[in-house]
Design a protein with these regions (language model features):
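Soluble non-cytosolic domains of exported or imported proteins
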Residues: 11, 30-33, 48, 97-102, ...
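Structured segments of extracytoplasmic/periplasmic soluble domains
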Residues: 7, 23, 38, 42, ...
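Extracellular/periplasmic bilobal clamshell ligand-binding domains
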Residues: 135-174
Length: 174
């Protein structure tokens, strides 16, 4: 929602949020996989879920029922004709006064190696952080023309967080 505010303004995002909430098939409950299961069961036509959960379910690691459910859903990526879809980010950092700076740098450097990234994408189903490593083929969107939002500054998410919470509360988002 903070990303939407950064791109569309608070008022337009508030209108969108009211429409979004009014179209919810049920009160929000459960995690991402619960949303995917609800769609597969016909309880809703759409839900918001991270793609790595669909891939996890497709992998069979969460059982045959979840694998079958994931096969019934189709991902949709918004804003593909515009700025691209919002993506959650993962990051690594080091505290200014970290007692083991050299080891912290080594860890971050290791996490950005091809070996580590391949392990990450094949076990968490997240998108890779470096060129030369492909997403796991189970990740939805790999075979689609997917456009990531590279326009919106991550800094804006924090700057718009309070506004996002206010917009969601006013819309009745629980």
């Amino acid at each position: 929602v903070a990303s939407l505010i950064a791109n569309n303004g608070k008022n337009k995002t508030a209108d969108w949020a009211k429409g979004f909430v009014s179209n919810m098939a049920r009160k929000p409950k459960g995690n991402d996989r619960a949303q995917i299961l609800a769609i597969a069961a016909g309880e809703a036509d759409y839900a918001v879920a991270n793609t790595y959960y669909i891939a996890l379910m497709l992998s069979g690691k969460k059982g045959a029922e979840q694998q079958a459910a994931a096969k019934k859903v189709m991902p949709f990526f918004p804003n593909q004709q515009d700025r691209g879809a919002h993506m959650n980010i993962s990051g690594a950092g080091m505290l200014k006064h970290a007692p083991n700076k050299d080891n912290a740098v080594k860890l971050i450097e290791f996490l950005l190696t091809k070996q580590a990234q391949e392990h990450i994408v094949n076990n968490t189903f997240e998108y890779p952080m470096i060129d030369g490593v492909s997403p796991n083929p189970l990740v939805p969107g790999v075979d689609l023309s997917f456009k990531q939002d590279l326009k919106t500054s991550v800094k804006s998410y924090g700057a718009k967080q309070a506004d996002a919470i206010e917009v969601m509360k006013l819309a009745g988002w629980k």
